[in-house]
Structures are given as structure tokens and as C-alpha cells.
Amino acid sequence: MGQLIAKLMSIFGNQEHTVIIVGLDNEGKTTILYRFLTNEVVHMCPTIGSNVEEIILPKTHFFMWDIVRPEALSFIWNTYYSNTEFIILVIDSTDRDRLLTTREELYKMLAHEALQDASVLIFANKQDVKDSMRMVEISHFLTLSTIKDHSWHIQGCCALTREGLPARLQWMESQAAAN
């Protein structure tokens, strides 16, 4: 009986998917990861290296790698690309000065062979802050409309309040089911 249940789970649910959470420092990557996991704000020191957590949903679970990107070690991201199905790019919507760097990093990732089939979810974080950039402005600056080879979605959010986060896990789950 146990083997039958295990077989049914392998066919109909409990699929594992690898996710990398990337972005420049202080964008909110770790806060978003732990909001998904615990639904609480976890106050932490800046991440050194990476964090990995498993987010379990009824039919899917995601292994999420929160990867720091120190300027001198940007090449380190490549080591996490193998088997990645989803890229979550976190952007600080208040930081116009580093948006060019974010765009360059995004297109480097999308050009990488190991990520050719990855779906992209962009969180425009800190939407609760006055004068933050809106989705239209960020989409335009990142030239998201030119991305044709990857499924992508941009979502405004506030990691501290969790606004905009839950529905995106559902988007990832539906993307995973479609593939």
C-alpha cells in the first residue's frame, strides 16, 4: 500500500523545482524567502554566501536558493544555475541608480545555457515607499517586452507586509505544472 501511495505522489504531486532568488544587495531577497517560508519578517544580517529553504505546497515543492551577489564575486551565481527552473529577481523599486546593473545581470543570466528554459519572476520590492518606481517604469527600463524565450512576470510587492507575494507562488506552481 505504501508503494502505491508513493507512486501516486510521484505521478500527481510533490514535484521538486529549483528556484534561485537573485538581486543586488539590500533588495529584499532573504526577506521574501522567509516570508514564503514562515509568513513572518525575519530580521537578519546581510547574507554571506547563500540560504536554501524548501517551500512545500500541496502538489509542488520548491527548493529556493537565496544567493548573495557581492560585486567582486558575481561569477558565483553561475554555480547555482544547473537544474534551475525559476529565477526570482528581486529589485529595490526605490533604487534607480542600480537598475542598469540589474538589467545587465538579468540579461547575462537569460543568455546562460543552463537557464534557457527557466521562467522569470521579477519582484519590484518596496512598493510601499514613497516615490518608488512602478511596474511600467521598471518594465520599460529593463526592456522586459524583448524577452521572448522565457516565461516572465513582474509583480510589485512589499516584502515587509507580504503584499503581492502569495499569488506569485501560485503563478510559479502553474508554470511548473505547464512544463
Swiss-Prot record:
Gene Ontology MF annotations: GTP binding; GTPase activity
InterPro entries: P-loop_NTPase, Small_GTP-bd, Small_GTPase_ARF, Small_GTPase_ARF/SAR
Lipid attachment in record (N-myristoyl glycine): 2
One of the GO biological process terms: intracellular protein transport
UniProt keyword list: GTP-binding, Lipoprotein, Myristate, Nucleotide-binding
Pfam families named among the record's database cross-references: Arf (PF00025)
Disulfide bridge positions per record: none
Binding site for GTP: 23-30, 66-70, 125-128
UniProt cross-references to PROSITE patterns, sorted A to Z: ARF
GO cellular component: cytoplasm; trans-Golgi network
Gene3D superfamilies in alphabetical order: P-loop containing nucleotide triphosphate hydrolases
NCBIfam families listed in its UniProt record: small_GTP
PANTHER family associated with the record: ADP RIBOSYLATION FACTOR-RELATED
Annotated function: Binds and exchanges GTP and GDP.
Family affiliation: Belongs to the small GTPase superfamily. Arf family.
Name used for this protein in its record: Putative ADP-ribosylation factor-like protein 5C
